[in-house]
């Protein structure tokens, strides 16, 4: 399972063979987050949660606090359900896709590159690969390939 936290993120679940079980935009409320994760067996699920570590540069303190609260809801739901969770910095999982460095691209160009890579890896999803779900899919594949 790969989780790109934040309101504009997503969650993707792959089986051990890499088939997509579920791919969706980030649930809106803490209860919806809990219900999403509740569908999965804690003994058979590993979640890689992107460790952003801080708010986005230029965001207000209230936006940063909102992001931190949302991230806390994700962590608490995973903890409450006993789902093994591994945090991973974006630079680490992004490196495995050989796209270069995010710092060398405009944010919109970098997101487009990530979306294209997810579309290449998961062509069967078609339009379900969006800017909201592409990172989650790539994080889930990173999780699967590194046997987290």
PLM segments and residue spans:
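Phosphate- and other anionic-substrate recognition elements at nucleic-acid/protein interfaces
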Residues: 1-148
């Amino acid at each position: 399972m790969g989780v790109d936290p934040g309101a504009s993120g997503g969650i993707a679940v792959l089986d051990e063979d890499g088939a997509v079980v579920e791919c969706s935009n980030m649930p809106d409320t803490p209860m919806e987050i809990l219900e999403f994760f509740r569908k999965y067996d804690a003994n058979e699920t590993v979640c890689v949660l992107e460790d952003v570590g801080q708010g986005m540069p230029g965001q207000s303190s209230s936006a940063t606090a909102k992001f931190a609260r949302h991230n806390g809801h994700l962590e608490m739901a995973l903890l409450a359900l006993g789902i093994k969770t591994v945090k991973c910095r974006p630079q680490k999982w992004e490196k495995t896709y050989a796209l270069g460095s995010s710092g060398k691209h405009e944010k919109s160009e970098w997101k487009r590159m990530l979306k294209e890579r997810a579309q290449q890896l998961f062509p069967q999803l078609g339009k379900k690969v969006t800017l909201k779900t592409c990172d989650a899919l790539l994080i889930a594949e990173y999780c699967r390939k590194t046997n987290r």
